[in-house]
Regions:
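N-terminal, post-signal peptide beta-strand-biased segments of exported outer-membrane/organellar beta-barrel
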Residues: 19-112
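Transmembrane beta-strands of outer-membrane beta-barrel proteins
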Residues: 56-62, 99-104, 156-162, 197-203, ...
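Transmembrane beta-strands of outer-membrane beta-barrel pores
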Residues: 62-68, 106-110, 153-155, 164-168, ...
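Membrane-embedded beta-strands of outer-membrane beta-barrel proteins
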Residues: 86-88, 145-147, 186-188, 254-258, ...
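Outer-membrane beta-barrel channels and translocator barrels
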Residues: 93-97, 152-156, 193-197, 261-263, ...
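Long, internal scaffold/assembly segments composed of regular secondary structure
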Residues: 233-374
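Outer-membrane beta-barrel "beta-signal"
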Residues: 491-503
Length: 503
């Protein structure tokens, strides 16, 4: 209830600030144009975010998002979802040197047919999740709040931002999983205007907590819960009755940015980060079972020019190394389990390199853009002993286009489309299937089938904005749909519909 009260308060506050908004069409194009994808890394630095847009723009949106897969591409994430959301986003230009922005959202719905995962935030915590062979649908509720401020003092740029996420995921039939997540993010940024550039530096940190448990109301239907350790392995000593976990951790990132203040020039972004998450068995006096560590590096460099025709070319590289430490647990004494050592057993390497470009026109209340991107992606997972390996590589190409234009004094239209293809280049698997149970072997074969597959995707979206007479308030409706075709003769379809208010 307290989250809903806070959400309503923020919505009302932002609506009261609507009188600060600038002309709708020009602001809409400035904030929503595809050209802004080039500036996406800069928005992470609140000092640069405060100088990114000239005009205020706010919107409140109610949406429904549906997705269905004929067979789960990733069993741990399920076969699809039905989610409804209410969100408000606002960027207010206070004066030529200062801006404030904020957002709030509430999302609720159902995740369908999850298997081999009883823990929330699978993508963040994998492979160290609790799992069973039955699974089922889960219900989700998520609240998010964020706010930031950026200002310019002479040639110095300063900014700060805070964001909070609270999430509850549960199942109302056996096995009754429950995950309660809280995450706090803090950002601080600084910048300098010099030599026709904005130079920025960012420091960012998160604090993460999750409590996770599984219960059975039918004593005759109890099945084991496994504490997974990667690539079909599990902590067998604590499987079965130990069904309460906690996750504690966080992250720290630094980033450096450079963007030209004029209409053309080189731009660049470099970020370094580290995440660490510890898994604790709360049903055994908070025994630490494992620790997952991320080390990340990402860089983008390109050239952009804004004139009658906008164009840009860039190169991007990202690398993430994840390693998992498993604790060696000694003999218990009165429910106390001593940790006598640790071994780094799980290793995961993900590399993505790409080049791309964008071309089009953007001015005032209209815009059109096309983009092309091509790259190579390699993902390698390894478990040290007994040796297990899952390696795959894909080459990909993506193309996208967007058209935004006023149709009359009150009606504006936006159309967009994108398509992509991920082609398998190589794959390799090493697994001791002779020593694996049939359920675990089936799970690994399913995973290998889809991670090595090739994929083709296409998406369309259309949005109409209607501006009320003699008012800065507008109404809009948007519909988007897409399809993903898998070379394993499976597919995914999705549809999203939204209505909202701009101010």
């Amino acid at each position: 209830m307290k989250y809903k009260t806070a959400l309503l308060t923020m919505v009302c506050t932002l609506c009261m600030s609507a009188t600060m908004a600038s002309p709708r069409d020009t602001a809409r194009v400035e904030h929503l144009s595809m050209w802004n994808q080039l500036s996406a890394p800069l928005l992470g630095n609140p000092a640069l975010h405060g100088a990114t847009y000239d005009k205020s723009y706010s919107e409140m949106v109610l949406s429904v998002d549906c997705q269905h897969q004929s067979e789960a591409f990733v069993e741990e994430k399920g076969k699809g979802h039905v989610l409804g959301a209410l969100a408000v986003n606002s960027y207010l230009r206070m004066n030529p040197r200062s801006a404030v922005w904020g957002s709030a959202s509430y999302t609720t719905g159902k995740q369908k047919s999850i298997c081999w995962n009883s823990t929330s935030d699978y993508e963040l915590l994998a492979p160290y999740v609790m799992a069973d062979t039955l699974g089922g649908d889960t219900h989700r509720e998520r609240y998010t709040f964020s706010g930031g401020y950026g200002t310019q003092l002479g040639r110095v740029l300063l900014g700060g931002e805070m964001a909070i996420r609270a999430e509850h995921e549960y199942r109302d039939r056996d096995p009754r999983m429950r995950g309660i997540v809280t995450e706090l993010l803090l950002r601080g940024g600084a910048g300098l205007m010099a030599w026709h550039y904005r130079w920025g530096v960012l420091a960012e940190g998160t604090i993460y907590k999750q409590t996770n448990s599984v219960d059975f109301y039918n004593e005759l239907g109890v099945i084991p819960e496994y504490h997974m350790t990667g690539l079909g392995t599990e902590y067998g000593r604590f499987a079965g009755e130990q069904r309460s976990l906690a996750y504690r951790g966080g992250s720290f990132d630094i980033a450096f940015d450079a963007v030209p203040t004029g209409n053309e020039g080189l731009y660049g972004h470099v970020s370094l980060g580290r995440n660490a998450y510890e898994r604790l068995l709360t049903s055994a006096n908070s025994l630490p079972l494992s620790r997952l560590i991320y080390n990340k590096v990402e860089t983008t460099m390109g050239w952009k020019q804004e004139s009658k025709h906008h164009w840009a070319a860039y190169a991007h590289f990202a690398f993430t190394k994840r390693s998992g430490d498993e604790n060696l647990i000694g003999k218990s004494d009165s429910q106390y389990y001593p940790v006598i050592g640790k071994l780094t057993m799980y290793k995961d390497y993900l590399m993505d390199a790409s080049i791309g470009g964008m071309y089009g026109q953007q001015g005032g209340d209209r815009s059109w853009m096309v983009s092309l991107k091509a790259g190579y992606r390699n993902h390698r997972e390894r478990y040290v002993y007994p040796e297990r390996l899952l390696d795959r590589a894909h080459a990909y190409v993506k193309v996208a286009g967007e058209w935004m234009r006023p149709m009359s004094r009150r009606l504006s239209l936006s159309l967009g489309a994108d398509a992509g293809h991920y082609a398998r280049v190589s794959d390799n698997m090493v697994m001791p299937f002779a020593n694996m149970t049939s359920k675990f072997a089936e799970m690994i074969r399913h995973k290998y089938r889809f991670v090595k597959a090739s994929y083709t995707e296409a998406h369309l979206h259309a949005r109409g904005d209607y501006h009320l007479k003699s008012s800065s308030i507008g109404l809009f409706a948007e519909v988007a749909g897409g399809m993903v075709l898998c070379s394993e003769r499976e597919q995914q379809v999705g549809l999203r519909a939204s209505v909202g208010v701009t101010f």
